[in-house]
Amino acid sequence: MSVPTIREVRAYVVRGGGGDYHDQQGTHWIDDHIATPMSKYPAYRQSRRTFGINVLGTLVVEVEASDGTVGFAVTTGGEPAAWIVEKHLARFIEGAKITDIELMWDQMYRSTLYYGRKGLVVNTISGVDLALWDLLAKWRKEPVYHLLGGAVRDELQFYATGARPDLAKEMGFIGGKMALHHGPAEGEEGLRKNLDILNDMRNKVGKDFWLMQDCWMALDVEYATRFSTIAWNEMGLKWTEEALPPDDYWGYAALKKNAPKGHLITTGEHEATRWGFKMLLDMECCDIIQPDVGWCGGITELIKITALADAAGVLVVPHGSSVYSYHFVITRHNSPFAEFLMMHPVPDQVVPMFTPLLLDEPVPVNGRLKLDDTPGFGVRLNPECKLSRPYTH
C-alpha cells in the first residue's frame, strides 16, 4: 500500500470558546480576579482580559492528504499563528509523506529558531503536529493512542480545575484545583484572603480530597514558599502549581528545596520543547511536570519530554488539552491521572473543553473516562462554528 503525501495545509481562526480556552466572556470563572504576572499593576488585576489574555484566539490547522483524508487540530494562536503556517511552515508539510512526522517537526522547529523556540511559534508547530497525528491515525483507521503504543490502563481518572472543588468532589473527581486570587502586590491582606479561601474549601471537601492551587506565574520565591508552607501545614494543600515565571529555573529549584516535605511543586504549562523541560528536570525544579500538548511541541515532542521525565523519576500530568492529552496519557506509565478543565461559566456542570468548536468530544463520567477506537483523536469540527482563513499561500 502506497503512503499518501500531503496535498495541502490550511490554517483557520475562530473567536470565542474553543482552542483558546482563555477567550471567554467576562462572567466566566476563568476571567475572575485571578493572580497573574500582571497583578502588580492595579489596572490589570481584576480581570485577565484587561491585559489581553484572549487576544490571540483559536488556531485550527487542517492537513489534507493526496487520497482525500483530512486531519485537523486546534490550539491557541489565532491570526499570527495562521500566518506562520501559511507563509512559512507549509513548505515543509506539503508534498511530504503523511508518515514523516518526525522529519516535518524537525524542519519546522529548525527553520523557526531565529524567531521562535517557544511561545507562539511552538504553539503553531504543536497545532500542525497534532493535525498530522490525526491525519495519520485516520488514514490507518485507528485512534491516535494505538499509534503511541496502546493503552496501559483501562480508563483515565481526572482531577478538575475550576472555582468549585466541592462540586468537583460531588461529580466524582479525585481532586480539585483552584486559581489563586491574590498576588504578592496585594500584601498581607491578599495572603490572608488566599488562605481563607483555601481553608473554606478544605472545610467543604473534607480532609481526604485533593486540593491544589494554580498560581499562574504570579508569585516570587519568598511568597510561594510562605504560602505553600502554611497551606500544607494547615490545609493539606497537595501541590502549588506554576508559582513562578517559567524562565525562573533557579527560583523553582529553591522553591522545591524550601517546600515542606510531602508538599509537591508542579510546573510546565508554559514551558516548551525537550530542552526547556530538561532544564526543569536537571535542576530539580519540580515534582510533576505539566506540559500542554498544544503548546509544548505537540505529540512528537511530548514523547521526548515524557521519556526524559520517566528517566528522572518525575511524573507527567499534562495541562488540560482534552483529547490531545487523553490519547497520550492513556499510553504512559508515568502519567497516572489527567486534568479536566471545567469550562462551564459556573463550574457546576461537566462540559467538553473545546465546546462548541468540536463535536463528539468525550467528557469524564464520575471522574473517569474510557477512550474508544474512533480513528484519529475521535472528534469533528462543528460546521456551525464560523472559521475564517485569513491567509493563503
Swiss-Prot record:
Function: Catalyzes the dehydration of L-rhamnonate to 2-keto-3-deoxy-L-rhamnonate (KDR).
Gene Ontology annotations of biological process type: amino acid catabolic process; carbohydrate catabolic process
Keyword Nucleotidyltransferase: no
Entry similarity comment: Belongs to the mandelate racemase/muconate lactonizing enzyme family. RhamD subfamily.
Residues that bind substrate: 22, 48, 339
Extra facts: Reaction proceeds via a syn dehydration.
Residues at the site labelled Transition state stabilizer: 339
Cofactor requirements of the protein: Mg(2+)
Binding site residues for Mg(2+): 214, 241, 269
Subunit organization: Homooctamer; tetramer of dimers.
Catalytic activity: L-rhamnonate = 2-dehydro-3-deoxy-L-rhamnonate + H2O
Enzyme Commission no: 4.2.1.90
InterPro entries per record: Enolase-like_C_sf, Enolase-like_N, Enolase_C-like, L-Rhamnon_dehydrat, Mandel_Rmase/mucon_lact_enz_CS, Mandelate_racemase_N_dom, RHMD-like
Keyword set, alphabetical order: Lyase, Magnesium, Metal-binding
Site for Increases basicity of active site His, residues: 292
Protein name: L-rhamnonate dehydratase
GO MF term list: L-rhamnonate dehydratase activity; magnesium ion binding
CDD domains for this protein: MR_like_2
